[in-house]
Regions:
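TOPRIM metal-binding catalytic domain and adjacent DNA-binding surface shared by DnaG-type primases
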Residues: 1-47, 194-213
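Alpha-helical elements of the RecA-like P-loop NTPase motor core of helicases
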Residues: 19, 98, 156
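Terminal peptide-recognition signature
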Residues: 21, 92, 100, 143, ...
Length: 213
């Protein structure tokens, strides 16, 4: 696990980080609200990256060239203010979570209902047991994990532990590996039969509508 020194947490404003998020079709207003900008040193060199805080005070760390974490590693559990929510949506990583919020904002800009439910972000499928512990109090749980073996295993583990309350929503983007690919219009290799590479495109209104949930 990388060692980070001289950590400084700032508001997310660096042009390179915002450009990276824009290229992933992430709504920048949402990104600024949900993430921070981290400046740190590693092996004597200075770096900056997007930070996404977990429930134990650690961070998921991401920029165009690096994906890692600052310990302690844990899930992120986002609870809305006010009355307890009965529903919770589960995502594999921060980019999936940001993609979902961006899709909802695009489809329902005047009333996206982003605070109608709580959210759990695994930050790693190895954290699925921690997620299950956090999900016990919810009546309705929607899993929007990756369409790969690790994502399916994590979804199955949640379904096995929590039963009828769990809905696997990955079929809504079944031709895509994950929610960010869905947002960007990049189909998974299993569903693409053309030889030429597929370009990232801005999603159509119909694509966003599928995740009205």
């Amino acid at each position: 696990e990388p060692s980070f020194e001289r950590l400084e947490v700032r508001e997310l404003n660096h042009p390179a980080l915002l450009r990276y998020l824009s290229e992933r079709n992430i709504d920048l207003c949402i990104a600024r609200k949900e993430c921070v900008e981290l400046h740190f040193s590693h092996n004597g060199k200075n770096y900056f990256a997007i930070g996404f805080k977990n429930k134990s005070g650690g961070y998921e760390v991401r920029n165009r060239f690096f994906k890692g974490c600052m310990s302690p590693k844990d899930i992120t559990h986002i609870r809305q203010q006010g009355e307890p929510r009965y529903a919770c949506y589960v995502f594999e990583g921060m980019m999936d979570y940001l993609s979902f919020l961006s899709l909802r904002m695009e489809k329902f800009p005047s009333c996206p209902s982003l605070e109608a439910q709580d959210y759990v972000i695994l930050n790693s499928t190895s954290n699925v047991d921690k997620a299950i512990d956090a999900l016990h109090g919810y009546e309705r749980i929607s899993c929007l994990l990756d369409n790969d073996e690790a994502g399916r295993k994590a979804t199955l583990a949640i379904e096995t532990a929590l039963g009828y309350r769990v809905r696997d929503a990955s079929h809504l983007y079944s031709e895509y590996n994950d929610l960010n690919d869905y947002l960007c219009g990049v189909k998974s290799k299993q569903s693409v039969h053309q030889v030429q590479p597929v370009k990232r495109t801005v999603p159509s209104r119909k694509r966003g509508a599928a995740l009205g949930m």
